[in-house]
């Protein structure tokens, strides 16, 4: 699925517009799935607006399109599991369950594993019974068998690295580390201020309705958010060739927590605050993106035009960007291969992350 979105962007805009259109499609799907979940659980609409800010996380900035698409697939899985009644598993229901599991697997194997975990945990919470859980799990056996055959064949492609854990407790749970895992795309005070505002929003809602108890919470979404938080807290930061193994779950956890928690009570003015805050944040982010492109990518078209056909290219990236965290230009030299063909000294496409393998 991570290849499908830029592929759809390639059709109308060509290779140089494929990335932008693909990310736009991913953003629409991510936010649309979030609002669908919010509406299905009958939560306040303003909660989905607040939760939408977590689209702009390091997952987006690092280009983990498959993981973004997996969020959409998992919400479909969540809703199917929620609406499928316990009892006799008909062929139609079994096919639907298999199709939803296959969609999870084809987007990202981590989401497939998480989906299986949610099937068990939520099934036990709902007291579906062992037989019903086994019936549903049996629908996923062909997918699990495919994963067992496929994964060993590609695990050693490209680069591998040792499993990495944070060296200290503070390395994961300090305020700075939490802010980087929750958003982590842009340098400066913009993202920490936004995260603080979201946490304040959650806190106000909880405080205002503290006497209502569990009635104002969505218990299933709170359980889901807890599983996301657990994945962020206990998983390694890096495993094999999977970067941000733990951190990628925190934006999902916070977005789900915002929907699960009670929204603050107040007049229309208070409900206007999240929309205004999201608009200002998106405007600031857009200006920073534009500034980065104008200052860091000036002349790239001329450079590509000056190269011969099918060159051999060595890509080097040593300078930290003053706007973005991470390394947004790590693969900029890959545009040479898109425009002129040839060979690169390194490409993330060299190792398989899905059923598509680059040779």
Predicted regions mapped to residue ranges:
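Loop-to-helix entry region of an early transmembrane alpha helix in multi-pass inner-membrane enzymes
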Residues: 3-4, 11-29
